[in-house]
Amino acid sequence: MKEYKLFLAGEWTDTETGKIIDDKNPADGSLVAKVHTAGPKEVETAITAAVNAQPAWAALLPEQREKVLLKAADHMEANLEYYAQLLIDESGSAFMKAMDEVAQTVNIVRAAAGECRRIDGGIVPDDNAGELSYWIRQPLGLVAGISPFNYPLLLCANKVFFGLAAGNSFILKPASDTPISGIIIAECLEAGELPKGLFSCLPGPGSIVGDALVEDERIKKITFTGSTAVGSSIAEKAAKTLKKYHLEMGGKNPAIVLKDANIDKAVETCLFGAYFHQGQICMATSRIIVEEEIYDEFTEKMLERVKNLKMGDPHDPMTIVGPLINANQCEFIDEQIKDAVSKGATLLTGGTHEGAFYAPTLLKDVTQEMNIFYEESFGPITSIIKAKDSEDALRLCNDNSYGLSSALITNDLSKALSMAPRMESGMVHINDSTVMGSRRAPFGGVKKSGTGREDGPFSIDEFTELKWITIRYEDKQFPPM
């Protein structure tokens, strides 16, 4: 049985004040590995080492930091299939999703490496005569990241590698359900010969590791992906030390399908957005708002496709829907369905589960009286909602406290370009899925979906602060004092 030690300040060590936990496969409950978790002593060791190591790292030339990150990416790419198998075993990711996640993570690491050379500054056209005025970007210092279980490797990397690229040191607390994904990051950084002390991976409970990182004044920023409830708690605690924070939280993402859309293409787009990775994606399409003229035809074709989705062993390359992260999530979805059906919704297919496997589920006639209209589901379920026209569709789209991603499917690009700015989400994708990513675009939401933006130069913005510098080269006459 594999046993993973803590990666503490660049060294693999046994835990002293934490525990050794069982990391289990959500598909069958089998033991994947034993994992050492951090306690108070390990957190303190990691913070002290990271604070001490950061100035030398920040002082390196950009190409020196870039070299370390590129070597880490090469190591990950060389072990792509092995790491994908770990993702399948630990998180229940289907084979297709796991392979894609590792490949995309390699791209993220290389994108972060490229940003090392792009961290810029600028000249200020100052109105003070005899003075040169300019600004620079500087690293924050020590940054901590708290990552989720759904895209555990990719979202760990998106935090860690951009943070390091900007010249910071970094402490990662991976999700308790997927600690090995954080350990993979540590293995890659070790292969890249990252200097000792700069990075620690600290699996462990949020109440011990997470709270300690959020509340410690030596940590200058928290970057978090997860639930809105936990993110709000982090913001509250971080405010006590005036700590910066970046929060990427929940979503109840709508796809609007207008009456002029290609229905077959709209179904394909919504099917992917709703059921890829069992719907356990913050951007998952969980509300499909369809104009009434095509509502019945769209629903019929969507139902046919959902019924044919293959659920089963995530190691099987043909599997589309694997297990949820744990069986508790199944019970939450059951309650959503029960409430919706009692208020007039129709359960077209699914609504059953065995262990952590939840059958692909489709509801129609969902309305604003139902909890599922507003609540994130985080499972293989989506709702079809009828709209009278495009303006009604927009109203239904915006009636939610979340605002992460949205889609608009139509052949009328003039109408699409008019509607997109009025859709209350951080990202709008016209004729594409709500599930979209880019290494250069600003990823993030509005409302209760979060604060800040990440990816590419926007991540560098999050991990640096600006400093204004002036140089006086002519005498200045001050007022008489």
Where are these regions (language model features)?
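Residue-level signal for inorganic ion chemistry
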Residues: 29, 65, 87, 109, ...
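ALDH superfamily catalytic-core signature
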Residues: 229-367, 396, 430, 478-479
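Short, well-ordered beta-strand elements within core beta-sheets of diverse protein domains
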Residues: 31-38, 53-59, 145, 255-258, ...
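Glycine-rich loop-to-alpha-helix module at the N-terminal edge of alpha/beta enzyme cores
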Residues: 32-119, 130
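Rossmann-like NAD(P) dinucleotide-binding subdomain of oxidoreductase/dehydrogenase enzymes
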Residues: 121-265, 387
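Conserved C-terminal structural/oligomerization subdomain of aldehyde/semialdehyde dehydrogenase
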Residues: 28-34, 219, 256, 310-311, ...
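Hydrophobic face of amphipathic alpha-helices that form TPR/SEL1-like repeat modules
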Residues: 1-27
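Structural signal for hydrophobic packing residues in well-ordered secondary-structure cores
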Residues: 54, 58, 73-80, 84, ...
